[in-house]
Amino acid sequence: SELTIRNEKGKDFACIEDMDFQIGRVLEALKETGEYENTYIFFTSDHGIAIGKHGLMGKQNLYEHSWKIPFVVSGPEIKKNTEAKGNIYLLDVLPTLCEIAGITIPETVDGISFNKVLRGKKNKVRNVLYGAYSGGFKPGMRSIKKGNWKLIKYDVMDGAFTMPRKVQVNQLFNLNKNPNELLIEHQNEGVIAITKNIPKKNQINLAENPKYKSRLQKMEKLLFSEMEKVGDPFKFWNQKWVI
């Protein structure tokens, strides 16, 4: 309900305010000890919750509003007020810290150092970003992102506590033109009245559009490749088993 969403947003804003205060205390302590200019500061977070977006409340989804998280770094030789557009995983933080500290990166580490990205010597370290959600009644939710294109693939049970049904759906988005991953439902007059947002006609799921069949196939192939690469045991209805 609208009241629930307002309540959750209030909690969100309160958390942000307190977090800002606590970070300020840390920064002041560094300045008081004279270590501020000689310290690398990494700020990031856990995944957020939807709070009404896409009609969802939790974070059991792979949309950008829940999947994408803040990542801010400051420190010596890092240019202020700059932004890197590339992708990273949190597992890339360890090798990055090792490289900054002059420590040999362990061979067992799967991450990639983005130290050169921080220093403006490289634009990105990853072209592809893979995401998975495997909780509860929705074990088959996977996503792949490359450039402006993103595919979310579902093989899940919907309404598991009432009348469960199998849902096998693809969602294809051009994030450059549809950054909020809007669906056809967002063009409903009732939804527009609540959100006060009028989507453009092409801001929908493109997976069912024959014009984007080739793009869908390419993204699916890339997704399946990444699943095999990381050893993901789940298999979609149209995914071939590799023995």
Feature-to-residue mapping (PLM):
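Beta-strand elements within well-structured catalytic alpha/beta cores of enzymes
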Residues: 12, 16-19, 23, 40-45, ...
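Flexible glycine/proline-enriched surface loops and loop-helix/loop-strand junctions
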Residues: 4-8, 54, 75-81, 99-100, ...
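Conserved beta-strand positions that form and line the central face of beta-propeller blades
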Residues: 50, 62, 71, 83, ...
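Surface-exposed helix-capping loop/turn segments at secondary-structure junctions
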Residues: 25-38, 99-108, 212, 222-237
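Long, internal low-complexity/basic segments
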Residues: 1-7, 15, 19, 137-140, ...
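Histidine-centered active-site microenvironments of extracellular/periplasmic hydrolases
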Residues: 28-79, 89
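A long, amphipathic alpha-helix that forms part
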Residues: 1-39, 100, 214-215
